[in-house]
């Protein structure tokens, strides 16, 4: 298993810890929002022109999404900007103060059980500009939950949805967007790629990923004090009051130029001869025991001239060019198509690194390599005299004819 895959497993554990601790809501930095929106604008300067943008799960007191779109309202050519926020009583703590303070100054008692709607569509102050100062707000009838009828109406009015939803609600939130057929850009965890509700959309080229985050980790502001003892927040990851969240990606259906840049790859022969990876150099590519595909442990080791199916790490999707490769499926239980499997296994003996043996059925969870001898220092599986190693989840791809090699 590669270092990247070990990190992915660590990311998964960390995310699960965060969900259990109810700490999966983070506020995105302005620079990260700007970088991603610029990618769309570089590809198409009119990405947002004449459109209504909805920012659900958003609170202008904390979130930079509203600030970015409000400050760039004219430059983007927006028609209307709508933000909604949850009611304080619907959240774990009462985060916002700015707009509640305005309500108190007007003699209106803050309504903690109701969410808010913020709208920007014209110059309110009369200074000749349309910006953050022109935002008008009022209370919603309900608590601001995106699943409510009134927020659904706002979704239906909008052309584009942009936000960073709580990771624990990612599947439901994405389905909520797709149901309405809207353009969108949302932040989620990379592990969502293999969700059975998400992968078919990626395979069908209805949504794709972008990864402008350095080393795949984003730094976010948390609305509550975070216990840095949690594995999700290692002390060396804490930066100026920001939390490092690993494995985050943008999920979108907005076009950007990066996804049309083909990977520069070597032929199979050159990879075997020159690859920088010891798993490939001088060894070649092994075939799975349970899929009609070869194992490619690194994206930069994909052979440019192989016409069959290849299993590649899920991080491949960060650099996936639909003009160069076709996604065939995913080798992972739950999300994958069982018809792609060529073998199903009975119970097997799992031999841990320390030699402990356990009866399991894990080999049916993903791609499997059959080996001649037990690997030294690695976990493996036995079925009779056969010895196997399990590979982490893989995206199954094949190259398109006439692609750029």
Describe the residue ranges of each PLM region:
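Class I S-adenosyl-L-methionine-dependent methyltransferase catalytic core
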Residues: 2-162, 166-405
């Amino acid at each position: 298993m590669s270092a990247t895959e070990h990190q992915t497993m660590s990311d998964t554990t960390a995310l699960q810890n965060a969900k259990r601790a109810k700490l999966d809501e983070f506020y995105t930095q302005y620079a990260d929002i700007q970088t991603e929106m610029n990618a769309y604008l570089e590809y198409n300067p009119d990405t947002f022109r004449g459109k209504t943008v909805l920012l659900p799960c958003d609170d202008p007191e904390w979130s930079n999404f509203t600030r970015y779109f409000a400050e760039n309202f004219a430059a983007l050519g927006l028609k209307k900007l709508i933000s909604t926020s949850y009611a304080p009583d619907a959240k774990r703590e009462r985060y916002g103060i700015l707009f509640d303070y305005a309500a108190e100054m007007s003699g209106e008692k803050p309504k903690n059980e109701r969410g808010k709607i913020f709208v920007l569509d014209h110059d309110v102050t009369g200074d000749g500009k349309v910006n953050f100062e022109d935002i008008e707000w009022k209370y919603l009838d309900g608590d601001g939950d995106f699943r409510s009828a009134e927020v659904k109406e706002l979704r239906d009015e909008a052309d584009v949805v942009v936000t960073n939803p709580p990771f624990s609600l990612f599947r439901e939130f994405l389905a909520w967007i797709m149901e309405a057929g809207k353009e969108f850009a949302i932040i989620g965890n990379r592990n969502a790629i293999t969700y059975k509700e998400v992968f078919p959309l990626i395979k069908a080229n209805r949504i794709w990923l972008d990864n402008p985050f350095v080393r795949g980790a984003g730094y976010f502001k948390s609305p509550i004090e975070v216990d840095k003892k949690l594995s999700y927040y290692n002390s060396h990851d804490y930066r100026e009051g920001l939390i490092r969240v690993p494995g985050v990606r943008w999920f979108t259906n907005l076009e950007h130029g990066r996804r049309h840049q083909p990977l520069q790859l070597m032929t199979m022969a050159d990879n075997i001869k020159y690859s920088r990876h010891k798993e490939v150099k001088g060894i070649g590519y092994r075939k799975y025991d349970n899929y009609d595909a070869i194992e490619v442990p690194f994206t930069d080791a994909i052979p440019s001239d192989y016409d069959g199916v290849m299993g590649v790490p899920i991080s491949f999707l960060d650099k996936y060019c639909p003009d160069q490769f076709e996604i065939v499926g995913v080798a992972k239980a739950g999300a994958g198509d069982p018809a792609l499997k060529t073998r199903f296994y009975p119970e097997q003996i799992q031999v841990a690194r320390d030699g402990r043996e356990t009866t399991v059925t894990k080999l049916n969870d993903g791609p499997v390599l059959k080996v001649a001898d037990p690997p030294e220092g690695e976990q493996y599986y036995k079925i009779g005299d056969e010895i196997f190693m399990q590979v982490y989840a893989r995206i199954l791809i094949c190259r398109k004819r006439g692609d750029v090699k």
